[in-house]
Amino acid sequence: MIERHHPVVERIRVPLRNLGSAFEGFRVVQISDLHVEPNLNPALLRKAVDMINGLQPDLIAITGDFITHNAKVVADLTAPLADLKSRAGVFASLGNHDVWNAPRRITEALGHHGIRVLTNSGTDLTQGHDQLWIAGIDSAWAGDIDLPSALKGRAKGGPCLLLGHEPDYADEVAQRSSNLLQLAGHTHGGQICLPGGQPLMLPTLGKKYARGLFQVGGISLYVNRGLGTIGPKARFACSPEITEITLSNTSAA
């Protein structure tokens, strides 16, 4: 179906407490679930890279499932990602398919393309006197999550951007943290949906939060519909997605 060849840009605004003025209006562009083999058309990935660069993002986040099964091809098939441009860098977390196959190979290949994979780790992004913690966790389905390690070093009460592939893990994150935006994928938004977007099938750890923006306790969660497909090479009522997220201070939201 031709829908899978035409990504759309979704734009949202997410407030975070204690977000410094230097990060007011900070724009994060997210993609997810590339599944570069066997189903992703290379032309679609190049098109997505061009669309992302056209948005001139401050930061790019990629939330896992770079492959489906064959990690040996990941370096070549993800080569267009080396052309991604953002002011603060490109960060990623791994998905369940990445972890089931060859997480080290994928992490190294992405690093070669200038993409920093965060697995149970984080880093402090500083602009002037203001800080934003960027963190990533392992796959909740296939890996071994260590959320405290991912958040270690974060300023108390400070704003945080967390890359975590499976959206339903947000319930656990919300019990252990707050003032945080989790970016997830995994569900493909359902991939094949009824008119209006009702998913016909959703994966483990993706059944509760299928697509879009949610408030989960004291955190926000955004679930991206992904770029690629798994199983049938088709999408219906569920276009591939590039998300532009603008951060704002709670008091300015």
What name fits each language-model region?
Residues 55, 81-87, 152-156, 174-177:
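Short, conserved loop/helix-junction motifs that constitute active-site signature segments
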Residues 10-16, 121-128, 212-216:
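Short acidic-hydrophobic surface loop/beta-edge motif
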Residues 108-115, 119-121, 127-172, 235-236:
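Binuclear metal-dependent hydrolase catalytic cores centered on His/Asp/Glu-rich metal-binding motifs
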Residues 25-35, 131-139, 161-165, 220-225:
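Active-site-proximal beta-strand elements of phosphoester/diester hydrolases
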Residues 5, 20-118:
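Membrane-embedded segments
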Residues 1-22, 253:
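N-terminal membrane-anchoring alpha-helices
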Residues 32-36, 64-66, 96-97, 121-122, ...:
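Active-site metal-binding loops of divalent metal-dependent hydrolases
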Residues 112, 167-246:
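Conserved beta-sheet core of the metallophosphoesterase superfamily
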